[in-house]
Structure formats: C-alpha cells, structure tokens
Amino acid sequence: MCQYVHREKNKMNEQADLNLLDPEAIPPDHQSGFVALIGRPNVGKSTLMNTLLGTKVAIVSPRPQTTRNRILGIMTKPQFQIIFMDTPGIHRPKHPLGEYMVNAAQHAIPDADALLFMVDVSVEPTPEDRDIAQLIIQGSPDAPVLLVLNKMDRLKPEQVKAHCQAYWNLGGSEKWYDSWMMTSATLGENLDELLEQIVATLPQGPRYYPGDQITDQTERQIAAELIREQVLRYTRQEVPHSVAVVVNEFKARSETLNYVSANIFVERTSQKGIIIGKQGKMLKKIGAAARPNIERLTGTKVYLELWVKVSEDWRRNEQQLRHLGFR
C-alpha cells in the first residue's frame, strides 16, 4: 500500500472539501508557496507545523534530532496554499546519518519562497543559531525571512529584552529578517498572527497539491515514524538515536482491518535486548502505544507485528543508510 494521506472528511467540511478540489473554484489572486522551517534541533519546528495544520504529520519528542527527513505539511484554504517544509535540526554531524539530515535541511533553503527561522527564545542564542542565521543570509538572499521566537511560555519576564535583542542581532549590524513573532507552538500562542505574516509573504501562484492532501508522506512512511516515536518515548541513552524503522508490509485484510509488519533496526545486540525487554514486555509496550496512532491514521483496526533486527553501526554505513531509505 502506497497511499498519500488526505484530510478526514465529515458532513461539516464536505462542501469545503468539494470547493478545494474544484480547479474552477481557485480565485485568480490565489497565493501559494513553499515555506521552510529551519532551525537547530528541538526548537519546536515539527510541533509548530502540526499545530498549524491541526493534525499530526511529523512525530515529536523531547529528544533532539527526532526529525530525520524533510517532510511536507500542506495547508489549503480557498485563498491560498502553504506547503510547509519541516526539516531536520541543523547541527554539527558526527556520522553519515547526521550529514544526511543536515543536507536535507540546507537543501530546503534555496527551494523556499519564505523561511521560518525558529529559535528557542527561552535560552540565549547558541553557536548553531548564529551559523544557521549566516546560512540563511547567504543561501536565500531574496526569500522573506520570518524570525520565530518560539517557546515564549518558558521565557522569564526578566529575560525578554536581552534574549530578543540577542536573536535580532544574530545577522550582524544590518537587519537580516523581514519580520518576527514570539510564539508558543505547544500552547498555540500567536499562531494566527504568525499565519497572517506567512500568507503575506506568499506570491500569487497555483494550487500545487490537491486540496485534501495534507502531506507528501505515505501511510507506510508515517506508520514507520509512529512506531519510532514510541521507541523514542520508552527508551533511554543512546538507544533512541540508534533506531530506524522500516515497514515491510502494509496490507488491507478487510475493509475494517489493516495488517502492518515492521522491522526495528538497532546497531548492537545489547540494544536489541533493551527494545525487546524482559519476556518481550518492552516491545509489547511500544506496539501497544503505536497501534492506536496507526489506527487513527488508517481509520481502521490494525494488526501490528514488530521485529527487532541488528544492523551494526548502520548510521555510519552508507550502504545500510541507503537500504533504510536515507539515500
């Protein structure tokens, strides 16, 4: 099964869906564009995209470097279509997987019609923040830059002036961004205002994707990520970063039941034991937590089978990276 994910339909939005799917209903002044979410790991890029879309397209966790691929999230309204490009956090890579992730983020910059540079305003700028600001200035000089000061809910009152000023000055003496907004993606603070700023930057253009499509990810790809999300949730230390998930089979057994089989790859035998757990309890816990999310994705019951396999040092092995879909 290789099916792109679309918005759920109900009686309330049925007519709206029909209008969004009708090419004749697109107004002549329709706006559209690709908007890249850029920033270091764990600043809230995926959370922001999910919240703006009103649905979960990208997995989230407190762990840095959760996002490994560029993921599109598509917002379609009668007057505009925004294609958000959620990207891996830009960091200083230590292995080929990290290089792949950073390249995926960097390649999104010149492709974007607008850039959301996201930072964690509750802490002072890091060297990575400064590097990313320069990367944006040099890599996309013509695209509007919106500086998103996220995690405002964690910002202490006495920090506001100093932290904001430090981020405003990241690009040097000259103003390097077009507008800024303080937000809390988790609480939904100021997101309507941010969306207005994003739409204001968009050029007039066509509807690039069908009006009911919300992502470029297939059900199989999202299911793999939903399983990995639970591994991130329940494991500790180096194990979460050493895991990759591949869905081997995604098959409808009836109109109300899908069968999903997936391999969880780790780098060492000791990690395999941790994920399986005593008497298989950890693996059962991961499966039990992932299954309801996959059922919400498919709208059916899901029979989920998980297998744990060792692919030694796969993050440093180019051939294994390709096998796991990272090349």
PLM features: residue spans?
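Conserved, well-folded catalytic cores of nucleic-acid-processing
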Residues: 55, 74, 78, 93, ...
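Canonical P-loop GTPase G-domain recognition
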Residues: 143-144, 153-215
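G-domain G4 guanine-recognition motif of GTPases
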Residues: 87, 119-122, 146-160, 181-190, ...
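P-loop NTP-binding site
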Residues: 219-327
